[in-house]
Amino acid sequence: MTEIQRLLTETIESLNTREKRDNKPRFSISFIRKHPGLFIGMYVAFFATLAVMLQSETLSGSVWLLVVLFILLNGFFFFDVYPRYRYEDIDVLDFRVCYNGEWYNTRFVPAALVEAILNSPRVADVHKEQLQKMIVRKGELSFYDIFTLARAESTS
């Protein structure tokens, strides 16, 4: 493992710890806070469907199924899962991208990581210069930018 890769992996792990990214479902009412109209609309639609089913002779026997399904499916809105970021997921296009998104392109690295790379005696001057050029050109760097630098370091 190269020095840049090690520093990037440490940063990703500290980010996972700080943001409680552990792939575990946690009870949360963030859905209600973010989408109160949708949440109320769900209940209005549920009660409207329930009223129609109770009025119908053919559907009134399966009302219990509607109630059970609604409760089960509604339960999913009360759980958030914060997926764990991993170094191995960077620049990989597979199912995890659908789950995590391309976080490595949309999140910027902390300034502490850039400073650690620039101050590390184990990183070659060529890579430090390349990093400084990237900073001048782009301003803020994404995790993917540092990943490409780590890849360049491993090939040299």
UniProtKB/Swiss-Prot annotation:
Cytoplasmic side, ranges: 1-35, 80-156
Per the record, membrane topology reads: Multi-pass membrane protein
Which InterPro entries does the protein's record reference? Answer: Memb_YlaC
GO CC annotation: plasma membrane
Q: Which terms are listed as keywords in the entry? A: Cell inner membrane, Cell membrane, Membrane, Transmembrane, Transmembrane helix
UniProt entry tagged with the keyword Iron? no
Residues on Periplasmic side: 57-58
Mostly located where? membrane
The organism is: Escherichia coli (strain K12)
One Pfam family hit? YlaC
Name of the protein in question: Inner membrane protein YlaC
Q: Which gene encodes it?
A: ylaC
Any idea where this protein resides? Cell inner membrane
Q: Which domain of life is it from?
A: Bacteria
Transmembrane region positions? 36-56, 59-79
